[in-house]
Amino acid sequence: GCQFAAYDDRNAQMTLWDEEFCGALAERGHFVIRFDNRDVGLSTKFDHAGVPNVAAMMKRGADRSAAPYTLDDMADDAAGLLDALGLESAHVCGASMGGMIAQTVAYRHAGKTRSLISIMSSTGNPELPPPTPEAMKVLMTRPPADRAGAIETSLRAARVIGSPGFPIDEERLRRRAGATYDRAFTPLGT
């Protein structure tokens, strides 16, 4: 079957990819690959590099040279995972910053990319309109360290970035956010 690699947002773990969605892909013959990006979940932590100011780096013309690593590095990680799994190529999919990583995989590792699916993402072009202030506020706010606060932060983010045409299932989201917290809470993940 086809390989389908899924990348997620900056401090989101692989567990945020819906099990039913991934299961439906698998039932259709896809080998679904989900993984935690650097500094997130159960992946390698780069604590020695410090915590970058992501909001400042998102500003137009911002100097990103102080970042401990780049989208290129994260795309190379993804391509390396395909190599480690013995896979020549995959359909690459990412949401939010994961979409930016997927785009970077597609241009840095074109031979490994069967197709590109970029969900609610950006090219990073500074001429594009920025996110709304409400979205920036909720996305740039680090969740509190306690489980209940982290779950509520996830719900707030879902309400802001979700579509009014597709209401969120709050109980389902609470369960998934709680399971993600229990697996490996990494609020400073980038």
What is each PLM-predicted segment?
Residues 1-61:
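Conserved HGGG/HGGXW glycine-rich cap/lid loop of the alpha/beta-hydrolase fold
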Residues 57-69, 135-144:
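Short glycine/proline- and acidic residue-enriched helix-loop micro-motifs
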Residues 31, 88-91, 112-115:
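Structural signature of beta-strand start/N-cap positions in the alpha/beta core
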Residues 94, 98, 102:
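Gly/Ala-rich beta-loop-alpha elbow adjacent to hydrolase catalytic centers
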Residues 103, 107, 114-145:
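Flexible "cap/lid" loop of the alpha/beta hydrolase fold
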Residues 131-190:
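Alpha/beta-hydrolase
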Residues 74, 92-94, 119:
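Short beta-strand immediately N-terminal to the catalytic nucleophile in serine-hydrolase-like folds
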Residues 59-90:
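Conserved acidic catalytic loop of the alpha/beta-hydrolase fold
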